[in-house]
């Protein structure tokens, strides 16, 4: 790691700059990038799914949001790396600018950062007289490796997607002066009904597209199993050349998924507008909801098998449980995991996104075990669920915290909402049930929920307390409700259930997709109201009827 930092400092000096931002993303801006291709991981050793780092002449700064504070502290070498712990409401841009001096120059790798991020950064940096400089190639990436060839791409049937790719193309009805630009692999997967499961924790083919009213041009190095009038397929390497040739058009694009490198190829005669594909894919078709109900039912069965294994007499490590959960998903028909399973026992359960299940950390009597998992089944839409289990008999503190988190979920799920309910409302209702634990050292330092779709973290919606997320729900949005409490070095509890918006008007209704029972041994029923006990009894009875309980 020290050699990489030294090389980067020499690179910065050669560019007459003062710092460089090293990213965790790949050149498709994917959320989950495997560690061998994760440049940020190679520099700091931090394995979280998000969080870039800044290398300067005298320091290395690792940005970590609330999910990763404890994990980053454990993984980085503090003799080399300083962890910048973002607080809720702050942004990575603020953290970046805070560590840079006035009149300094920051290098960004243009194909690893979104255009929208760069525009905001440039505006805020200008106030501090900080210059932003762009390079096209990541200085520490192995460019010799072609990452996107020889992968299998499959088409999801209309019984799940409702419309074929050709039908979606025809329904677009673009104007003569409009071009739809698709740079986000998840948007591409949605629009084409194509999936690729060769990359870990992803179902989206690595491809981009340029669409007009009579042509659908795909840019990829994968074999595409589609054929219809107007479809053309090109090598991925030619995408920017085609993009640069577009003139005097209204380009519809998801600006948050357009890399700065792609943006730099767009001629100034064009006008950029929002494509809204990200909103379309969030409103699931009824056929997709039917599939998700089936996929979550199978995910529930995986957790039942995990419960049985934990409560067997076997000596088990976290890694044993990690291997088991992958096996159980395969047994239930999953083609892959939608994210790396989190198996966190004992004090590790306080690490919100604990990433490395240990073969040395044995499960002991009284340990709580937090399991956060999900899979991709035949429909290529993610599942996501979290349960906290216990081995043997828990102490009173574990029961109190678990019950507190359970009460927060019940409150949010059963509340009568108005038709104008926002994403922010969901978070605020959940959060008000947990903040009084701050005084005891237990923190709820992540958002209440996220959208779920082809990617396990889909936007929209995002259920956060920030005013930017005071936006209305739409019918058939799928999202998580996942209250949690975590005390560093002690324990953590998270209970995550996926729901979908059954209706917005005249009444706002949500319905659960995951039905796995809660851990009775961790519930202090004396802390529940009568209505909460009634809800819990009905929930647990459903589990018994569906063979999810012992």
Model-derived regions, located:
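Active-site neighborhoods and metal-handling regions in enzymes and metal-associated proteins
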Residues: 1-550
